[in-house]
Amino acid sequence: MGNTSSERAALERHGGHKTPRRDSSGGTKDGDRPKILMDSPEDADLFHSEEIKAPEKEEFLAWQRDLEVNDKAPAQARPTVFRWTGGGKEVYLSGSFNNWSKLPLTRSHNNFVAILDLPEGEHQYKFFVDGQWTHDPSEPIVTSQLGTVNNIIQVKKTDFEVFDALMVDSQKCSDVSELSSSPPGPYHQEPYVCKPEERFRAPPILPPHLLQVILNKDTGISCDPALLPEPNHVMLNHLYALSIKDGVMVLSATHRYKKKYVTTLLYKPI
């Protein structure tokens, strides 16, 4: 019933907080009993789960390192033209791409031009004309929080896809030309000697399309006998000779004048 004097003294020494009473076995009550982690099969899986997932963690770290390397890779520099058309005697270019240092522009007729290799992305720049800072009003501009007006330019990879394709084509053409101009095999200084069979080789046969002479074709009944059929374009500007008959040689030639064809016949007695 109630606290003893010794308990009251102890309570006063602890600031009015009563310590939990232990039973004869040295334990505390069920409500104040501390939680003790017992060994179990689930605990073993819990402690070794990191070792089981180690390969997946290594793959993730490797992927993250590759991603960081790709992000840090410098963008390809692209040739960019800067032009000042506002006149002046001395014009300089300054921008975020050169830490706002002055770069002199080259005079070309009435303009000032500079070509710089800039990385892909957004860049700001200004012109220093005859001792005065200014910007080009015909180009895009951007205004800072301090009220400074600068020109802005976007260097995009898509703007140079045509040039990249032309460069690839030129490289392919150069490779083909090198292969075609330098066939494989040994090279020497000995002159080429014609073989006997090559010296007495017969002339080439007449192309077959030249054998279709319009003067040898029969004119249809429905056609005007005074008109010849339209010749093939390969028959033009050629001289044809008919076999000699009755001591007369017949020569013919067909020419084109705009959309008309004119065939001339020449009869020569032999």
Swiss-Prot record:
Region feature (Glycogen-binding domain): 68-163
Modified residues (Phosphoserine): S5, S6, S24, S25, S40, S96, S101, S108, S182
Pfam families: AMPK1_CBM (PF16561), AMPKBI (PF04739)
Entries under Gene3D superfamilies matching the protein: 6.20.250.60, Immunoglobulins
Region annotation (Disordered) ranges: 1-46
Record PTM text: Phosphorylated when associated with the catalytic subunit (PRKAA1 or PRKAA2). Phosphorylated by ULK1; leading to negatively regulate AMPK activity and suggesting the existence of a regulatory feedback loop between ULK1 and AMPK.
Signal peptide stretch: none
Keyword line: Fatty acid biosynthesis, Fatty acid metabolism, Lipid biosynthesis, Lipid metabolism, Lipoprotein, Myristate, Phosphoprotein
Lipidation (N-myristoyl glycine): G2
Gene Ontology MF: a single term: protein kinase binding
Transmembrane segments: none
Basic and acidic residues: bias regions: 21-36
Highest taxon in the source lineage: Eukaryota
GO CC annotation: cytoplasm; nucleotide-activated protein kinase complex; nucleus
GO biological process: cellular response to nutrient levels; fatty acid biosynthetic process; nail development; positive regulation of cold-induced thermogenesis; signal transduction
Keyword Lipid biosynthesis: yes
Modified-residue entries (Phosphothreonine), positions: T4, T19, T148
Family: Belongs to the 5'-AMP-activated protein kinase beta subunit family.
Function of the protein: Non-catalytic subunit of AMP-activated protein kinase (AMPK), an energy sensor protein kinase that plays a key role in regulating cellular energy metabolism. In response to reduction of intracellular ATP levels, AMPK activates energy-producing pathways and inhibits energy-consuming processes: inhibits protein, carbohydrate and lipid biosynthesis, as well as cell growth and proliferation. AMPK acts via direct phosphorylation of metabolic enzymes, and by longer-term effects via phosphorylation of transcription regulators.
Oligomer and partners: AMPK is a heterotrimer of an alpha catalytic subunit (PRKAA1 or PRKAA2), a beta (PRKAB1 or PRKAB2) and a gamma non-catalytic subunits (PRKAG1, PRKAG2 or PRKAG3). Interacts with FNIP1 and FNIP2.
Domain free text: The glycogen-binding domain may target AMPK to glycogen so that other factors like glycogen-bound debranching enzyme or protein phosphatases can directly affect AMPK activity.
Name of protein: 5'-AMP-activated protein kinase subunit beta-1
Organism the protein comes from: Pongo abelii
